[in-house]
Regions:
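Enzymes that bind and transform nitrogen-containing heteroaromatic metabolites
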Residues: 1-135
Length: 135
């Protein structure tokens, strides 16, 4: 399984049960990067309602996604799925937002290799960085 996450400068993902930010260009970039097909839960699907991509919405998407699927993760703990993940695309907001849920970067950085890094301007962010890691 492959995973896409969005984090701030301190690996924050959520604050008070809500995503920190969203960006139209990032969604387009992520969908294109994933080959136009994404798996996600209903919370994440709300922000993809106007994107032109094939979305599979399931609450248990991390358990049910095929091995080669790209899963856009915002509000699900990834630690129970570490053994299933082969690649991860981290989108960095390059800003600091309030957060109370952090992405477990330390769990990934010890075992993972950075294979690419790309920066691009977003619709609401001056600069977004995509980092792709694999085992």
């Amino acid at each position: 399984m492959n995973v896409i996450v969005c984090i701030d400068e301190q690996n924050g993902m959520l604050f008070n049960g809500r995503r920190q930010s969203k960006d139209r260009v990032l969604r387009e970039h992520a969908a294109s990067f994933a080959g136009g097909k994404l798996w996600m839960n209903s919370y994440t699907a709300k922000q993809f309602s106007e994107e032109n991509c094939d979305i599979t919405v399931e609450e248990a998407f991390l358990s049910n996604a095929p091995e080669d699927a790209w899963c856009f993760v915002e509000n699900v703990d990834l630690k129970p799925y570490l053994h299933k993940i082969s690649r991860i695309a981290v989108y960095r907001w390059n800003r600091l937002y309030p957060s109370d849920v952090k992405f477990p970067m330390a769990d990934f950085s010890a075992r993972w290799t950075l294979v690419s890094r790309e920066e691009f301007p977003g619709s609401s962010h001056e600069r977004i960085t995509q980092e792709v890691y694999q085992l």
